[in-house]
Amino acid sequence: MALLVPGGGCARLGVSLPAQVSKRRTVIAALPRPERETVDWVDATSSFFQNDSRPIMLYDGVCNLCNGGVKFVRDNDRNRRIRYEALQSEAGRKLLRRSGRDPDDISSVVLVEQDRSHIKSDAVLRIMEYIDLPFPQLAFFLQFVPQFIRDFAYENIASNRYMMFGRSDSCELYDN
């Protein structure tokens, strides 16, 4: 066992056990019980799909690239198969929780369907499947690119999106 000592070094700590060791456990501290009940975010957000089963695209509302992406999807979705919600909105934060993500995490586009959620390149491919030709066919071929390569490209663009495309002063919201 090592022990950190002042000055940045380490010291070796030797521990000798008696010949007979009892396996008795003593509780030193217990975690407090949560004051609130655990929230089932799927149930809490089921109203989003009660009257409208279309998937919801969650996007960064202050990102110029993301807003351009939403406009592109809207222009190529003549049948209005996708709804839109900014990640920063209250509904967006709830849907992030439903997807098992941190409500403050705006690092990825998320496509929330009734029974599952998609992030990063999987979300982009799934969105492409919903919009007009030729994008579903393009998504079909892109799925053969290994996910780690697709996500690597996605993450590099996403982490530099403000620097490359800028940021807007206000969060853009779109009507569904």
Language-model features: locations:
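Active-site-adjacent beta-strand anchor residues
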Residues: 59, 85-86, 143
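Thiol/selenol-based redox catalytic cores and closely related redox-interacting motifs
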Residues: 90-176
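N-terminal chloroplast transit peptides
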Residues: 1-23, 29
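Local sequence-structure signature of Cys/Sec-based thiol-disulfide redox active-site neighborhoods
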Residues: 44-76
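Conserved helix-turn-beta segment immediately C-terminal to the redox Cys motif
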Residues: 74-85
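A structure-centric signal for secondary-structure junctions around beta-strands
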Residues: 53, 60, 81, 105-106
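Short, charged low-complexity linear segments at domain edges
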Residues: 24-47
